[in-house]
Amino acid sequence: MALSKMADLKNLSVDEIDAKVQELKKELFDLRFQKATKETIQPHRFKHIRHEIAQLLTLKQQQS
């Protein structure tokens, strides 16, 4: 999954940003769980998810 473009994210409302952050945090939790149980994972997803969460939280702060 490719990273979202900032131009696409800027069109989101605060509620949509909150929902997307929650979704990404759940995905990050699931990845950590898979790693702990020795399942096959894609290590680069950790960085991508954290990066996208940071982008969303930055946009939320700017909109407030």
Swiss-Prot record:
Keywords: Ribonucleoprotein, Ribosomal protein. SUPFAM superfamilies: Ribosomal protein L29 (L29p). GO terms for cellular component: cytosolic large ribosomal subunit. PROSITE patterns: RIBOSOMAL_L29. This is Large ribosomal subunit protein uL29. InterPro entries: Ribosomal_protein_uL29, Ribosomal_uL29, Ribosomal_uL29_CS, Ribosomal_uL29_sf. Transmembrane segments: none annotated. Belongs to the universal ribosomal protein uL29 family. GO terms for biological process: translation. It comes from Acaryochloris marina (strain MBIC 11017). GO terms for molecular function: structural constituent of ribosome. CDD domains: Ribosomal_L29_HIP. The lineage of its organism: Bacteria, Bacillati, Cyanobacteriota, Cyanophyceae, Acaryochloridales.
